[in-house]
Swiss-Prot record:
Residues of the active site: E125
Single Gene Ontology BP annotation: mitochondrial proton-transporting ATP synthase complex assembly
Family to which this protein belongs: Belongs to the peptidase M76 family.
Membrane topology: Peripheral membrane protein
Organism of derivation: Saccharomyces cerevisiae (strain Lalvin EC1118 / Prise de mousse)
InterPro entries: Peptidase_M76_ATP23 (IPR019165)
Record has Aminoacyl-tRNA synthetase as a keyword: no
Origin superkingdom: Eukaryota
Protein name as annotated: Mitochondrial inner membrane protease ATP23
Residues engaged in binding a divalent metal cation: H124, H128
Biological role stated in the UniProt entry: Has a dual role in the assembly of mitochondrial ATPase. Acts as a protease that removes the N-terminal 10 residues of mitochondrial ATPase CF(0) subunit 6 (ATP6) at the intermembrane space side. Also involved in the correct assembly of the membrane-embedded ATPase CF(0) particle, probably mediating association of ATP6 with the subunit 9 ring.
Alphabetized UniProt keyword annotations: Hydrolase, Membrane, Metal-binding, Metalloprotease, Mitochondrion, Mitochondrion inner membrane, Protease
Main localization category: mitochondrion
Length: 227
């Protein structure tokens, strides 16, 4: 096992140079360096994720508003909502976050591009949290799932004009007039497709279309689409 001194300061610099040049590097040292490097990167990602999370809980209007709305719904509950319900961790899948009604919110520290990506992701998952408290969502019910995904993508800010344009641009079918709705629908279909009760992407699209009008129009707890 490595001492902490091996992974810091001059000794880490020496090991890095040795790894890059290969001079005097044994196979065991190479493997150990790669393992230590990965551990250092995971720790760095985790600390940055929690730093961004705490900043958003303090300063983001959307996040603060959603936390207040959740706290109001949660009055009288034995399970108080606080920052312990929002954790950062490594995710093997290509997703930026997740929500579980019993465990809370997961932020995928290795998938978040920057502070603002975390804000969109956290806002998205907080809307799921709100929906679950307000309507006791059955997450295996495809219509329930689709409705919350539509609301989360629409209200979180992840489908605002500039974010969607950065992802797609004009050459990938982006349309200014309906860009927001197209983005919401696309992302909802992707999420519902991952539900174990969903048969196919076409099945997910059908479910999303069935609940679209009422769910897209429902902006609670906001008065309108804020971001």
């Amino acid at each position: 096992m490595n001492s902490s001194g091996d992974n810091a300061g001059f000794e880490w610099w020496r090991r890095t140079m040795q790894y890059k040049t290969g001079i005097g590097l044994t196979p065991e040292e190479k493997t150990r360096y790669e393992d230590d490097s990965k551990a250092r990167e995971l720790k760095k990602e985790c600390l940055k994720c929690y730093e961004y999370r705490d900043w958003m809980l303090k300063y983001s209007p959307t996040v603060r508003f959603m936390v207040q709305a959740i706290t109001k719904l949660n009055k009288g509950s034995d399970s108080k909502f606080d920052d312990s319900k929002i954790i950062c961790d490594y995710c093997p899948d290509w997703k930026s976050g997740g929500f579980h009604p019993e465990l809370g919110i997961l932020l995928c520290q290795n998938r978040l591009r920057d502070k603002w990506h975390l804000e969109d992701t956290l806002s998205h998952e907080l809307i799921h949290y709100f929906d679950d408290l307000k309507w006791q969502i059955d997450w295996l019910n495809l219509k329930h799932h689709a409705c919350s995904e539509i609301r989360a993508s629409s209200l979180s800010g992840e489908c605002r004009f500039w974010e969607e344009f950065k992802r797609r641009g004009f050459r990938t079918g982006f349309h200014v007039a309906r860009g927001h709705q197209d983005c919401v629908r696309r992302r909802a279909i992707i999420s519902v497709s991952g539900n174990p009760n969903c048969q196919s992407k076409e099945h997910a699209a059908k479910i999303v279309d069935e609940v679209w009008d009422s769910c897209f129009a429902d902006t609670r707890p906001f008065d309108e689409i804020y971001r």
